[in-house]
């Protein structure tokens, strides 16, 4: 990756962290198709236990996903980052960590949140935005 493409990404993340990402569209539903150029997938506290968001960008863009901080109960819940539509290769299945960054190989990425039915949802925020094809 070129340094010139890293700098805007770092600036966006630092701004998003300071401003708590309040300026981005927030999705707190359990799944859906997201077509905004950027936004936040935020904790869904409802009764559903398997939430799938498919992020679609125009063909000339990749999807970039960033998770600043994640502390899920690893035995009971996880986030899965998929490179494309559901059923495509999994880029990561995660439950904890910080400063995680994923980039799709094409213009679609899927984020899946799964938890056990008796376990309450933990806090999570997933920032997504379009990234020009290089």
UniProtKB/Swiss-Prot annotation:
<dbReference type="GO" id="GO:0008083">
    <property type="term" value="F:growth factor activity"/>
</dbReference>
<dbReference type="InterPro" id="IPR000859">
    <property type="entry name" value="CUB_dom"/>
</dbReference>
<dbReference type="GO" id="GO:0007338">
    <property type="term" value="P:single fertilization"/>
</dbReference>
<feature type="disulfide bond">
    <location>
        <begin position="30"/>
        <end position="51"/>
    </location>
</feature>
<dbReference type="InterPro" id="IPR035914">
    <property type="entry name" value="Sperma_CUB_dom_sf"/>
</dbReference>
<dbReference type="InterPro" id="IPR000124">
    <property type="entry name" value="Spermadhesin"/>
</dbReference>
<keyword id="KW-0339">Growth factor</keyword>
<dbReference type="GO" id="GO:0005576">
    <property type="term" value="C:extracellular region"/>
</dbReference>
<comment type="similarity">
    <text>Belongs to the spermadhesin family.</text>
</comment>
<feature type="signal peptide">
    <location>
        <begin position="1"/>
        <end position="20"/>
    </location>
</feature>
<feature type="disulfide bond">
    <location>
        <begin position="74"/>
        <end position="95"/>
    </location>
</feature>
<keyword id="KW-0964">Secreted</keyword>
<dbReference type="InterPro" id="IPR052129">
    <property type="entry name" value="Spermadhesin-Link_domain"/>
</dbReference>
<keyword id="KW-1015">Disulfide bond</keyword>
<comment type="function">
    <text>Stimulates cell division and progesterone secretion of bovine granulosa cells in vitro in a potent and dose dependent manner. This protein appears to be a potent growth factor with effects on ovarian granulosa cells.</text>
</comment>
<keyword id="KW-0732">Signal</keyword>
<protein>
    <recommendedName>
        <fullName>Spermadhesin-1</fullName>
    </recommendedName>
</protein>
<feature type="domain" description="CUB">
    <location>
        <begin position="30"/>
        <end position="131"/>
    </location>
</feature>
<dbReference type="Pfam" id="PF00431">
    <property type="entry name" value="CUB"/>
</dbReference>
């Amino acid at each position: 990756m070129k340094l010139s493409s890293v700098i805007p990404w770092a600036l966006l993340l630092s701004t998003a962290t300071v401003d708590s990402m309040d300026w981005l569209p927030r999705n707190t539903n359990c799944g859906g198709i997201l077509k905004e150029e950027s936004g936040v997938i935020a904790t869904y506290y409802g009764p559903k236990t398997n939430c799938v968001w498919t992020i679609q960008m125009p063909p000339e863009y990749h999807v970039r996903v960033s998770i600043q901080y994640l502390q899920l109960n690893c035995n009971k819940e996880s986030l899965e980052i998929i490179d494309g539509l559901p059923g495509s290769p999994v880029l990561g299945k995660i439950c904890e960590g910080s400063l995680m960054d994923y980039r799709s190989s094409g213009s679609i990425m899927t984020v899946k949140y799964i938890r056990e039915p008796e376990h309450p949802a933990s806090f999570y925020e997933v920032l997504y935005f379009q990234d020009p094809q290089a």
